[in-house]
Amino acid sequence: MGDLESHDLVCRHLCKQTNATIIAVDYKLAPEHKFPAAITDTIDSITEIISRADEFNIDQNKVILCGDSAGGALAAVGTIMSRDKLIPKVHGQILVYPWVDMTMCRRSMDIDLEGMILNKKTIEYFADHYLNSYEEQVDWRASPLLTPDLSNLPPTYIFGAGLDPLVDEGDAYKRRLLSFGNEVHYRLFEG
C-alpha cells in the first residue's frame, strides 16, 4: 500500500522537524518478490548506508530504524539483527502501527468499520501474496513478535491507532519487549 512516493511528505516533515538525516528504503514488494526479499533489501540497505555514514552525513552512534505497518516489522527485524551483530549497530527503533505477527490471531484483526481500507480481509490478502507457507508465517523474520529472544534491544518507540486492525500486535510487541527488560515507550492514538 505504501512506497517511496506515498511516504515522501512524511519523511520530509520528519527531517525538517528533527534536523535528522532520513533515508527511505525502496524495498522489493510482493507479489512479485515474496518473503524474504523485503528483509534482504532492508538489511542490505542498512548495511550499505551505515558503511557510508560519512558520505550521508550520518552519526553512526545515532542510527534509528523506523517503519510503519510492514515497514515496522522490517525495522524490528533490522534491530534484532543488529543486536545479533549480523548488521552494523543501530541505536533505536520507531515502530508505527507495526505488523509484527503474520499469524493474524489478535482480536483487533476483527475491527472492520465501514469505509476502512485496512481490515482482516486485506491483511490476509497481503500475507497470502507475501508468504509461501505456514513455516514462513511463523518465521521470526516475518513475525518479529514470535522472536524467541527479545533481550538487549535499544530503546523502542511504538505508536498504535485504536481502530487499526494491527493495534493489538503493537501492544503485544510492547509487552514482550518489556518482559525482556527493554526500554519501551508506547503511545496509543484514538481512531
Residue locations for each model-derived region?
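Alpha/beta-hydrolase superfamily serine-hydrolase fold, recognizing
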Residues: 1-191
